[in-house]
């Protein structure tokens, strides 16, 4: 019975082993004269492709690449072409490494353009404030009108900063903030700075040298033996 089953298996799969086709035949590698011949060719193809596949490919992808893109003419691999020339046009190979000198030149050119841009600008920092009167300048969809703080560099003749009320200035502008005199006087009275002439200890730092010289001069001379 066992001999009969082995004979049936051999008749169904003549070029297989233990009733299984070789992977080269399942993947469509073509007809080979003997199992030993296609086994040797399959191993050589696998070795060449495993050598030229990039490092980020896993084993399944490398096997698939070796089985699908192998150059087979009439069932025989093209052995006359060198392996390096055979896989130069592979789509799985990474991009060629560019010269580092070219990258350095491009970086220096970008830095030069960046410096020229910032030196051309009169004020590198942000010196724009939003339009304070949107009714005079209607907005056009996504375009928003801006005007500069300095009227010399502006085109729409905006009002000077000294004439703009402090209530409508942005909170970041400290130099142009206006202080009410009543508030300032209330702070002076609260801190006692209005009685500065009546408090001599506030002037001690300025008259300290004169005070020490006068105090030493007024002391009686003491002679020690």
UniProtKB/Swiss-Prot annotation:
One of its GO terms (cellular component) is nucleus. It comes from Xenopus laevis (African clawed frog). Its main location: nucleus. This is Cbp/p300-interacting transactivator 2. GO terms for molecular function: transcription coactivator activity. InterPro entries: CITED. One of its GO terms (biological process) is left/right pattern formation. Transcriptional coactivator or corepressor of the p300/CBP-mediated transcription complex. May be involved in sex determination, early gonad development, left-right patterning during embryogenesis and differentiation of the adrenal cortex. Belongs to the CITED family. It is found in: Nucleus. It comes from the Eukaryota. Keywords: Activator, Developmental protein, Differentiation, Nucleus, Repressor, Transcription, Transcription regulation.
